[in-house]
Structure formats: structure tokens, C-alpha cells
Amino acid sequence: MEPGNYATLDGAKDIEGLLGAGGGRNLVAHSPLTSHPAAPTLMPAVNYAPLDLPGSAEPPKQCHPCPGVPQGTSPAPVPYGYFGGGYYSCRVSRSSLKPCAQAATLAAYPAETPTAGEEYPSRPTEFAFYPGYPGTYQPMASYLDVSVVQTLGAPGEPRHDSLLPVDSYQSWALAGGWNSQMCCQGEQNPPGPFWKAAFADSSGQHPPDACAFRRGRKKRIPYSKGQLRELEREYAANKFITKDKRRKISAATSLSERQITIWFQNRRVKEKKVLAKVKNSATP
């Protein structure tokens, strides 16, 4: 068909054959209805050989010619986008891949090798955590191998002394009963130097009294002469004090009613002992 003529019936049949076969997608470039018989040449026509990758197992597929294109003529150049936007997968073997350039750069630097303990024969053992350990660590103070008194021995030398001086255990003797003496400073072992240094202030403010701790009893406070005179006067008048008299004496002597009651009980017991002693001495 010449360029200036219109499309004939044979040309329409050729178009229907192309649409039914599905040989191409972009038929605008090959349609005889357009003003140009062929697409403009974008690049020189080059025949490419099929690519055979080393890792590919399937044979390359051959492209079948379109039924509407005459075979005798030279093939026209295919424009961009003729086969659509699809992609073709390929397989590549691992041997064809190139190694990373960074690995070659890092390979130029030698790797550090672990150093054995025999390479440091001149290193002193006191700078290590344990004796004979060829490490670079400083000795760490712990309660297991370091004494409390740091002046005993060289620094870093392991010691196995106890943390604090502990006195030996002694059970309390209750031979005299519950009213007997429970704790006395003179009978205990003297405390260690650490306890003396730590509690020097507290012991200075509250000096310990000998045998001051008793079970259920307070420290005895002696009565003054004025209080004893008032109590003896009332005892001479009446050996058994009444409630009103007890209140008056409590207000006059600044003593509690319980203290006055106990004093009268003790005074009666004392009088009985004195009378019994006089009676025993009078009998032949």
C-alpha cells in the first residue's frame, strides 16, 4: 500500500488479525490508518544476541514474528515502551558476584591476637585482682580479702582477717535468780580497738555505771533529809498510813504516793528485824 492511499479492506483484516493474535501492544506505530507508515527512527537498529547467564537453567526464549508484518523486509526499529513496563527475571551465580570493597580495605589492617599470660613475666602480682593473674585491673577492696586496718601489710596484699573483732560468746549466768545481776561492765571482755574508736563520743557522754543494769529494777535514788524527817514523823504517829495522809505527805515532800507506800512497808519490815535481833540477844 502506497503512502498516499486510504486503508482498504485487506488492511482492516490485517488489523483484526493483529488484535486477535495479541502479538503487540503498541499498534499505533504500525497501523496503516495513521499518517505515517512507520514509527520515526529513534536509534539505529541493532540485533542483540540472547544472554545466557551461568546460573540460568532455562534456555532463552525466541520471539515469534508478528503475522501482519512481511518477512522479506528488514525489521523496523522498536520504539521505547513497545513491550510494556514489565520486567524479566534472571539468575546470577554466586561466583560472578564481586566481593565488597570495604572488606578488602579492612583486610589491610592486621587483626589483634589475644596475648597470653606468659608474655608479661615482669608484671608485679600486686597490681592484679588475684595473685598470679596477668590482668591490668587494680586491686578492689572487698571485705573478704582486705583487712579493716589498712596499715597492716602492704597495699594490694590479700588478707584473710575478719571484718570486725568479735568477742567470744558467753552465756548469761542465772544462778542467783531473776533478781540477780544480769550485766556488769567489769565482768565482760574489753572491747576491741575498733569499737573504742567508733563509740568514743557516745561513751564519753554517758559513762557506764558499774552494775547499773538490773532486770525489772530502777536505780535507787536516796531520799533527802527533809523527806526522811517528814516520813519518820508520820511513822511514829501511825505505822499504817491513810490515803489522806499519803496525799498530804506527797504534796509536802514531792514524792509519789507509791513511793510513800513502799517506804512505809520497808520501814515496818526493818522494825521487825530490829526487834527480832534485840529479842535474840536478850535471851541467854
From Swiss-Prot:
UniProt cross-references to Pfam families, sorted A to Z: Homeodomain, HoxA13_N
Effect of residue 216 to C: In HPC9; uncertain significance
GO biological process: angiogenesis; epidermis development; epithelial cell maturation involved in prostate gland development; negative regulation of transcription by RNA polymerase II; prostate epithelial cord arborization involved in prostate glandular acinus morphogenesis; regulation of growth; regulation of transcription by RNA polymerase II; response to testosterone
Gene Ontology MF, one: sequence-specific double-stranded DNA binding
Subcellular location: Nucleus
DNA-binding region(s) from the entry: 216-275
UniProt-reported outcome of changing residue 88 to D: In HPC9; uncertain significance
Keyword Nucleus: yes
Keyword annotations of the record: Developmental protein, Disease variant, DNA-binding, Homeobox, Nucleus, Transcription, Transcription regulation
PROSITE patterns reported in the protein's UniProt record: HOMEOBOX_1, HOMEOBOX_2
PANTHER family: HOMEOBOX PROTEIN HOX-B13, SEGMENTATION PROTEIN FUSHI TARAZU-LIKE PROTEIN
Binding partners and assembly: Heterodimer with MEIS1. Heterodimer with MEIS2.
Protein's name according to its UniProt entry: Homeobox protein Hox-B13
Source species of the chain: Homo sapiens (Human)
